[in-house]
A protein has these predicted regions:
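N-terminal Sec-pathway targeting helices
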Residues: 1-13
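Glycine-rich, small/hydroxylated-residue low-complexity segments
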Residues: 6, 19-441
Length: 441
């Protein structure tokens, strides 16, 4: 028995030694061949490969965004949509890649990606002093993404290097940005991501901060349009130059999408525990603001056509109009299943009062005339059909009446009173608007 165990142990050790010495070398050569093949494709499609250095188990190169016209055509063939203006803006951008092969037990390929040259358009519009500062930051690899791909090419993990730096009058902080996921040869099948903190602070114009974001994505089945995604954020704060500030706490976003028979049905759910808006004169606060919106029977064919069209190309205008008509007249329906708030701040008393709830749906007439709408946008009103239900607490209704922009409307629109609530049932059909059964126009 002891000899058997010893033999098995020696066999395992020998196998591992063979793998790490000989098998690893063979795999490294195959990985290098694959990289060569992909770089050759990129070179034929507008990119230039510069400063390439190849070593036994690693290599370095710089990917130069050189020919925007060729690159845009290549991206279009790969179903990656980029506007012509956006494509031109990136001309001259350079991204360096440091690749290591077969590092450790997990990784087949490890890479660091970081910019080494700004687009020409940015360089031309930047002062030499600021350009020198930016170039110094690029040399320090301030913006760096690390990525590991596992040895059976089914999953990945990575992170973004922490940032705490200043660009002129703009301070940027980013900490603990991590991601991982699973994939096949065709597409991403699952992923998670997290950000501990992200903020942009300017001297005068705008300050934005975000804390503790966690996101997940999971594909369902073979269709890229069938998936579940979820994001949770502890806090988002925005400070504007005019003194207005916005703060949101404990945010949840869920998106459930399913596809069948060339149609997409999606649900979007959002939850905000707290929303605070403060300007120079007023303060607005809402507790437990929740919504659920669904989009039904969205045409996959029309959506994919729209994604492939260059809207700046006049030759594709007819194709664009056809896709839009298919998208909006093929039974597509938008449902606002609910938008509701538990409590709303009465700023005059600084006390929270009962809130509101609402629901609605919108559809478009299948016989819509796009040419008429293009020449007369108001013609769209005759093609819309909608119903809505809005319920305000008595306290919130009394607050609304005090606002100048609403008081005049409420003089002509009388609500239904029921269970300490004010109710508005709204119908819009055939260019006629009714509220609580009374025709407004």
């Amino acid at each position: 028995m002891k000899k058997t165990l010893t033999s098995i142990t020696l066999l395992l050790v020998g196998s591992l030694v063979y793998y790490f010495i000989y098998g690893s070398q063979q795999i490294t050569q195959e990985l290098k061949r694959q990289v060569d093949m992909h770089l050759e494709v990129l070179q034929k499609n507008g990119f230039a490969i510069e400063e390439r250095e190849i070593k036994e188990s690693s290599e370095h190169f710089v990917l130069h965004y050189k020919d925007p016209t060729k690159i845009q055509k290549y991206f279009k063939e790969k179903n990656i949509k980029m506007k012509t203006d956006d494509t031109q803006m990136l001309k001259g951008f350079k991204l360096a890649s440091d690749i290591s092969y077969m590092q450790g037990f997990y990784s087949a390929v490890s890479m660091d990606l970081y910019p080494v040259a700004l687009p020409e358009m940015i360089r031309e519009k930047t002062t030499q002093n600021d350009l020198n500062k930016m170039q110094k930051l690029l040399k320090e690899k301030i913006f760096l993404i690390h990525l590991d791909i596992n040895k059976i090419f089914t999953s990945f993990k990575g992170y973004v290097k922490d940032i705490d730096t200043t660009f002129g009058t703009i301070k940027v902080v980013s900490t603990q940005v991590k991601f991982d996921g699973d994939f096949t040869t065709q597409r991403l099948t699952a992923s998670t991501s997290s950000i501990q903190e992200f903020s942009i602070n300017t001297a005068t114009d705008l300050n934005i901060s975000l804390k503790n974001l966690h996101g997940t994505y999971k594909q369902k089945g073979d269709s890229p349009y069938s998936f579940d995604s979820k994001q949770q954020i502890d806090m988002i704060a925005i400070q504007l130059s005019n003194g207005t500030s916005v703060e949101l706490k404990n945010l949840d976003f869920l998106n459930n999408s399913n596809s069948s028979d060339q149609r997409i049905n999606s649900q979007f759910i959002s939850k905000f525990a707290e929303l605070h808006i403060i300007d120079t004169q007023n303060r607005y606060s809402i507790e437990n603001l929740n919504s659920k919106i669904s989009l039904e029977k969205l045409s996959i064919s029309a959506l994919e056509t729209l994604q492939s069209i260059d809207i700046n190309n006049p030759k594709e205008r007819q194709k664009l109009n056809k896709a839009i008509k298919m998208l909006i007249t093929d039974g597509t329906r938008l449902n606002i299943e609910y938008i509701k708030a538990n409590k709303v701040l009465d700023s005059s008393t600084n006390k929270m009062v009962d809130g509101f709830d609402a629901n609605a749906y919108f559809t478009l007439n299948k016989n819509i005339n796009l040419r008429e709408i293009q020449s007369n946008p108001f013609a769209l009103l005759s093609a819309v059909e909608s119903k809505a239900h809005i319920s305000l607490s008595d306290s919130l209704y009394n607050i609304a009446k005090k606002r100048a922009e609403l008081s005049l409307i409420l003089l002509f629109v009388k609500p239904i009173s029921k269970e300490q609530k004010k109710i508005f049932d709204i119908t819009y059909q055939n260019s006629h608007l009714k509220i609580n059964g009374n025709q407004i126009f």
